[in-house]
Amino acid sequence: MGKLFGTDGVRGVANKELTPDLAFRLGQAGAYVLSKEHPHPRIVIGKDTRISGDMLEAALIAGICSVGADVLRVGVLPTPGIAYLTRTLKASAGVVISASHNPVQDNGIKFFSSTGYKLPDAVEEEIEDLVHSHEKPWAIPVGSEIGRVIEIQDAQRRYMDFLKGTVGSLAGIKVVYDGSNGAASHVGPQVLRELGVEVIPLSVTPDGININAGCGSTHPEVLQQAVIEHKADLGLANDGDADRLIAVDENGEIVDGDFIMVICALALKAKGQLMEDSVVVTVMSNLGLHIALKEAGIRVYETQVGDRYVMEELLKTGARLGGEQSGHIIFLDHNTTGDGLLTALQLLAVLKEQGKPISKLAAKMQRLPQVLINVRVKDKKKAMENPYVFQKVEEVKRFLGERGRVLVRSSGTESLVRVMVEGQDHEQLMGLAQSVVDIIKREEL
């Protein structure tokens, strides 16, 4: 697989790239590195609904127990729920088996520290070095020193109670909820109903194969139609591991992470609760977000793509709200990672407080036209370093000047290069983006 850790843990095609053997070795190395401070460590493990989850979980657990660590198994649970339980169960570390919004054949393994944060690059590198190394620095336990598996039967209930504690009653709101047949398929509709929301559920019947299949935050088309058909106040869509949220307004229009951050930031600022009067976003956020927040006296910090980098900037600046256009949004006062259900509840709370339709709240931001084209490539690094691609990007930058921007970046989790162009005229932007894409494709031949 080359370098194991990407921007969101280890990802690959399950049983081909991410094999049980690799999961076993990651379990051993991860447990050893993350548990050095603990004499008999305990590690939380959870997963999404993919068919390969059971296989990889079994291998991972075997690796962890073989170095003398106990496993706290929480079963199917959203990624942010696993981060929350890692903290509150006072575990030494947490592990999520999920490939988030990726298709069913993929899976992933992602570690959390004892505080519920994603691991720093240096710690991931230490784990990776051990996975590749023939040296095994840990002692081999026998007898009573081998790790046990402890089932956490009420894991979903604990997470739902935490979520409910962040807002008041949401009675009177009608929502179409799309669980992407993923980790939030049960807890999503349940927590909404317990808060008084009228819920029309979509894609909440996982069968191991249908996760993210034409549903969820990356495929909101069915949700858009359902919101209009049911005359709902809004639609909410999570992805496979429910660490992101995309909303749909009452007219069936997409309300992405940029709009959600603007809505929540303005509401928090109005109540004097926006720490540092600041928000952290990535370079992919629309220029319209920058304009809307600047007009409200809110400072915007920008970082590279990846919610781990958003988190680092939040900790550095003292801001408490940050996220990505894709819907990874971090409310640091409540949780240590992007949390799709938490974000949904905060958004619904603003809706209830202000008594306005979500389309009116979203109108505070005017989105500038933006074109994003994903190009599948054999070698991301080679494509990104190609001089002809660089030359074309510089040409587009000069043409746009201050009227827009162009951004070319490689995906952290897939073999893709993303070309994003933003400006005033959509048709013109399509042509500019395509001109960059054409060079990337030409150089692939």
Curated annotation (Swiss-Prot):
GO cellular component: cytosol
Catalytic activity from the UniProt record: alpha-D-glucosamine 1-phosphate = D-glucosamine 6-phosphate
Residues with the Phosphoserine modification: 100
Similarity remark: Belongs to the phosphohexose mutase family.
Binding site for Mg(2+): 100, 239, 241, 243
Keyword Protease among UniProt keywords: no
Enzyme Commission number(s): 5.4.2.10
Post-translational modification, as annotated: Activated by phosphorylation.
Keyword set, alphabetical order: Isomerase, Magnesium, Metal-binding, Phosphoprotein
UniProt protein name: Phosphoglucosamine mutase
Needed co-factor(s): Mg(2+)
A GO term, aspect molecular function: phosphoglucosamine mutase activity
Gene Ontology biological-process annotations: carbohydrate metabolic process; peptidoglycan biosynthetic process; UDP-N-acetylglucosamine biosynthetic process
Residue positions of the active site: 100 (phosphoserine intermediate)
Organism of this sequence: Desulfitobacterium hafniense (strain Y51)
Isomerase listed as a keyword: yes
Cofactor binding note from Swiss-Prot or TrEMBL: Binds 1 Mg(2+) ion per subunit.
Role, per record: Catalyzes the conversion of glucosamine-6-phosphate to glucosamine-1-phosphate.
